[in-house]
Design a protein with these regions (language model features):
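N-terminal ligand-binding/catalytic initiation module
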Residues: 1-106, 115
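Glycine-rich adenosine-cofactor-binding loop
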Residues: 111-114, 118-167
Length: 169
């Protein structure tokens, strides 16, 4: 069977494929899933002071690697400090299923974990995280955390990557 080109999502499409509430519920489920394997990330120094990060993970449904670079001086050049992708594979046949925008995955995952923590530690029947105005976050992460705190969604995806692979975007 010929290999199909994987779905390649840009930043906006990646964000649409990973709604905060659903992502938070998936994180909750993955934390309880014994099939999840996340080895230590590899950080490779680059010429000029940057770093290459390789972060593999897998569970019973997907295998994936987040591959990003961090170059602190990039913003002065008009480039993002963090660039990269998350590549999701089918563990049964090794085919790439989807390529997600790495910085968007990182920002949304981090905010979803904060949302999950707030909902777990201070549950609110209305489904919104209480005291979100008092959350502490870096200037770069703060907008993502606010969006997550205000987000509403339903249900848990079978996995964030699987959801993205099935998304029409």
């Amino acid at each position: 069977m010929p290999l199909e080109k994987p779905l390649d999502l840009n930043a906006s499409e990646t964000a649409l494929a990973l709604p905060y509430q659903a992502l938070a519920e998936c994180v909750r489920a993955l934390l309880q899933d014994d099939s999840v394997r996340v080895p230590a990330r590899i950080v490779q120094p680059l010429q000029g002071g940057g770093s290459l990060f390789v972060m593999p993970a897998c569970d019973a449904q997907v295998a994936m690697t987040k591959l990003i670079t961090f170059v602190a001086g990039n913003p002065a050049q008009g480039l993002p400090a963090i660039q990269g992708d998350v590549v999701v594979f089918d563990p049964a046949d090794g085919q790439r299923q989807v390529i997600l925008h790495g910085p968007t995955v990182t920002a949304r995952r981090t905010a979803a974990v904060s949302l999950l923590a707030a909902q777990t530690l201070a549950p609110n029947p209305q489904g919104r995280a209480p005291g979100t105005a008092r959350w502490s976050a870096t200037a770069e992460a703060a907008p993502w955390h606010r969006r997550a705190a205000l987000a509403s969604g339903a249900g848990c995806l079978p996995g964030p990557a699987a959801s993205a692979a099935r998304s029409p975007h």
